[in-house]
Structure formats: structure tokens, C-alpha cells
Amino acid sequence: MLRTMTVGVGLLALACVLLVPSAATAQQTSAIAGIVRDTSGAVLPGVTVEAASPALIEKVRTVVTDDQGRYNIVDLRPGTYAVTFTLAGFNTMKREGVVLTSGFTAAVNADLPVGTLQETVTVSGETPLVDTQNVRRQTVLTSDLLDALPTSTKNWATIVEVTPGFSGSFADVAGQLNQNLGNAYHGKTGTKRQFDGMSIDHASGNVGYLVNSNMIQEVSLQSSGISAESNADGSVVNMIPKEGGNLYSGNISGLYTSDRFEASNLNDDLRARGLTTVSKILKIYDTGVTFGGPIRKDKLWFFSSFREWGNGHLMAGNFWNKTQGTPFYTPDLSRPGDRFQWYESKAVRVTWQASRRNKFNFFSDVADDCLCRAIGALGSAPEAGLAFHFRPTGLYQGDWTMPINSKLLLEGGASLTITHWPTFLNPGVQPTDISIIELSNNFRYNASATYAYKRATDRGAQRFSVSYVTGTHAYKVGMQIEEAVSDVGTYVQGDVNYSFRNGVPTSITQYATPYRAIDRTRADMGVYFQDQWAVRRLTLNYGLRYDYFNGHIDASHIPAPASGWVPARDFAAVSGVPAWKDINPRFGASYDLFGDGKTALKMSIGRYVAKTGTAVASANNPISTSVNTVTRTWTDTNDNYAPDCDLNNRGTNGECGPMSDANFGGFSPTTHWADDVLRGYGVRNSNWDFSTEVQRQLGSGSRSPRATTATGTATSPRRTIC
């Protein structure tokens, strides 16, 4: 029954997504552009064009057509707009009901009749569905669709699931078993996640902030034709937050389900074969409150949300250990293995029109999350699974826009994603319990192999840009920079793991813990120039981007462990791991085939550098490249399940064989990265991406454009280790 309902919801989601126009501009602001003529077909320069919407705190944005009769109103939020055209000696024309989704440029043209009286002609036409100017391929989910989706799919991966061309691991329909999913679009990996145009990935590049869906107005995914404003070699998922308004509004919602609504296929035949439990949902819940409105009308708005959601599951064939704390695993059939997760978000966004020209947005989400027992189905006993508590965690952002005049726009923003997620012991596990792995079935019990007493993977991001927009050109220069830190402290209980085969001890693994490694991204920076040039029915999109990436490893002092197996160790700081520089051109063209804004031919080509976190610095950290683990054989001659030998003695003694590496605690001489791989121009992994597309609006109203797309990707390989 659950599967049937899920398929139905999935088909509904896919159908709704296909009703949304595709294409985009850079930081997911929308635009309205077009040409103004008189009734004879001659272009009209100097026409005042106004775009008004309740979505704008400043109420209206105004530009003037250039000498080609073209105009382009940029930096618009998603919403419904009325566009007014005014010129002395002509009747005023007003176009109502223009609906903008994020990243979409709506073509709104006008033919002004000559008139001596101040008369306004109001036109309510269909909203353009084909973006004839941008070449970026985009899919959009609106807030209405997000509200309709089940709790299990209210995360960033939702849009990936319903976008054709993606492959990989997708969201589990039974309740967010994995919020951190891998995927690829036409073979391109490296998905970047953004909130309001700034990264929310943590230091290693995975999901750093779990989004409160009640704060989201739209979610967009760009998959090809990405402009010079991004260095993504894969896709980009961007979440557009909601804003308050001049009217107070709010919402209270609550969803809950339990195992009482779930069927089971466990029958007598399966029980006879030894299956006693099945995987099932214990509960899924989602509660939320939103409230927003004016603090001061047309001046200061707010929108806030509190949301708490989570789930619980039972894992088939997995049981808690009845004899926990001993060398033995005895499944407790009365306690099936379970997994619980909960998430809490307290978010608020403030929009401030500080002056006629200066607008600020501030966002804060103080979150508290727990992946309580992140176990697999059969890989370990529940007590040996890892459990993470995300605290402190959250997202903090601020941005500023300043239109100097109708042509010149300044923008800036900063973001901080905080992700601290140390592990904690599962119920019943004592600090003295040693992790044991049964080699006959690769099953671990008693404790986890390793733990993290500290894990901070924070990321900061900043951006600044200057746009100069006429009707014919949309020039933009800007800079983006990100910094990240991965601060991880690792320990192993007792500094040892045991390996058994069929319950008999066979070997010991010794660890040189605890140790703490700090890896940084000092700069993931991009400087770019781009232009959108409209020439009759042809629009050229071209740009150039310079990317610079600099990694760093902090100096560290590791005291001698309590076991005394290795001495205190000191490691010097290492800079420029890596230090990469790249020049990345972008070019695209969009052609309005019939001039009616309903058919567009598009192509794009560009070079994109690979998404990179702190992984390269971590791989070159002298702590990571040291010999931190060794194994030795163990023959338990007296069956007491305790190694009767001196583990400080690196040679054969008592019941223990020699250490597998006599350099325990020292450097490994066999692995290092070549300098020409770590530093220089053009050595970073990169893609050349080529895309062609035909978009045709097949109907009006809710009917969508249809597209056929061919994408080719060429990957530039590089050596990594020598």
C-alpha cells in the first residue's frame, strides 16, 4: 500500500515539475525583458518600464528602454508581476499576470499605440513559458508542490528524484534514511547545494545544512549551460527562501504515521525459513509553524518558522546484544535493531529596505539534529553503529543589493554554515568496551570501530558583483570566495579492535589514538566576467572565469596516548595542498526561432573545474599519512579472550605475533602526491560540457515547454599519486 501511494505521489511530482519553465540566470533572481515598439513596428527608445509585485518590498522596479527599444529588469524575486509601459505621446500599456519562477527571464514585449489622451490599456496575456534568452537548463519546484510532498521527500534531493537524466542514490520513500545522497547527471558528479545562491555544503563537500522546507519558496536545479558565476562541474541545487510581506500570515501543520498503517509480508513460510522480523517504519512525523508579515510596512518584513520532524525504523534480522560488554554476541530476539532520527529548526528571515536604494536580507536558522544510530541493515549490531548529534549546527546569512540607477546594480552577501557532528555511545556501550568484528560474516558488535570526540566541518561563503544592464547587454563582473575547516578528533576505545572467526580470536588491531587533524580550504575563489547580448532574435551568453583553490593543513601536537604505544608527535603546518589555478571560458546562444517567444534553439559549451572540499588536504595531512594502525596475530591459548602479551612490544611475544608495520606511529614512506599535481595551472580535474536543446511551448496556461537535450562531457584526467 505504501509503495502504491509513493508511486502516485512521485508521478504527481514529476507532472508538476514539467509544468515549470526551464532556464536560469546566475544567482536565481528572475528577470523581465523585451522590446517596445509602436504599432508600425518601429522600436521606441526612452520608454519607462515598471515591474510591480507584492513580492517586492520596494513595490516597483523601473528601467528605460535603450536606443534599440530593449529593456531588461533584473534582480526580481519569484512572484506575479504587472508590467507598465509609459511614453509621452503614446497610450500607457499595462501587462498583468506575469508569473516568474526563480532564474527565469520572461519575455514581455509591447506595441504602444499613439494617443493624445492619458489612457491606459490593460492586457492580461498568458505567462511566457519558454526562456528565449538564457541557455542554462533548469528544473523548478514551487512551494505549493513542496507542501504537497510527503515528509520523506522534503529535502534537497527531492528535485533530483524528479529530474530526467539523473542516476544514483535517491531519497528513501520510507522516511529520510539518508539525507546525504550521491547522484550524477549524464555522468557528471559533484552536485553543489546552495541556499539563496550561497553554498551550504560542509567542509568535505557533502550536505552541511538540512533545510527547513517551510522556509522555502522554490527549489531549482541547474544541470547544464551553467554561467560563469559558478564553478560547478556537475549540477547546482539552489533553495530560494520565503520572505514576509505587508500582510500577516501564518500556518500550522502536523503529520504523523506509525506502523499501525503498514502491512507486513512476514508469513509462516518465511518464519519457517528463519526470518523472524521485517524492516518497517515505527513512525514518521513532521510538525511546523510559520508566521510572517510586516514589522513596518514597505520597510521591514519578517518570516519565521519552527519545524520538527523525524522518523523511526526497525531493521530486519538485526538485534541488540543480550550479552553486551562480553566477547560474545547473543541476539536479543525481543529487541529488534532500531534507528531513530530527529531534526529541529528555528529559522527567521528579515528583509529591510533601509533606503530607497539599499536593501538587506538576514537569515538565521539555529538547528539541532540527531542521527541516533546510523546503522545499516545487517552490518553491525545496534550498539556498534555510529550515532551523531549535530550541535551546534545551522545557517546564518546576510545579503545586500543597491541599484545605483536603472542600469547599475551592486550586490553582496555572506554565509556561514556550521556543522558540528561528534559521535556518542549507543545505549549499553561502556567506555571500556572493545569493538569486535566477526570475520565469518563481517559483523561488528560490542562497540564501533572508531569514534569522533570532535567533528567540526564548517564553511563560509562570500560574494560580490557589479551588474550593468541595458536592454541589449547585461554585463556582470563579480567574485565569490569560500573558506572551510575540517577539525576532526578520532579515538578508539582501548586503542584496539579484536577480530574473531567463528568466535575464536585471530588478530588484534592497535591504534595510535586519540589524534586530531585540522584541514582547511583557505580559498575556493572565482573571479568572473559575463555578458548577455541580445541581437534581434539571437541572444549570446558568454563569460570567462578564473578559479583559484588553496588548501592548508594546520600544525598539530599529538600527546602520547595513554597506552604508551607511540610517543608524542609533532607535525608542521603544510600550505598549498593544493594550490590550483584555472581559466574557464563559457559560451552559449539562444535563438527565438519564430519570433513569438514559443520556440527556442539553444546550445552551450564551457569548461568547469571539479568540486573540491578538504579531501586533498586530508589525504596529504602528515597525520593521515602516518602509520596509525597495525595488526598482529593473536592465538588465545587459554581461551580467556584477553591478549596475554605485551602490546608495547612490537615483536612476537606471548600470544601475539609481531606488528604488521614496525614504523607504527611514524611516517609512511610509500605514498605522497606529486608537486605538479598539487600546484599549477590546469591540473585540477575539469569537464568540458557541451549541450544542445530545443524548447517549444505546446500549449497555453499550465501547459509546459518540451525539450530535447543532448549533452556531451569530456573529462580532463590528472595524476593524483606517485
PLM features: what roles do these ranges have?
Residues 125, 252-258, 304-308, 362-366, ...:
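Transmembrane beta-barrel strands of outer-membrane/channel proteins
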Residues 242-244, 284, 296-298, 309, ...:
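Outer-membrane beta-barrel channels and translocator barrels
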Residues 123, 239, 289-293, 348-352, ...:
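Residues on the lipid-exposed face of transmembrane beta-strands in outer-membrane beta-barrel proteins
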Residues 249, 279-370, 388-415, 585:
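Transmembrane beta-barrel wall of Gram-negative outer-membrane proteins
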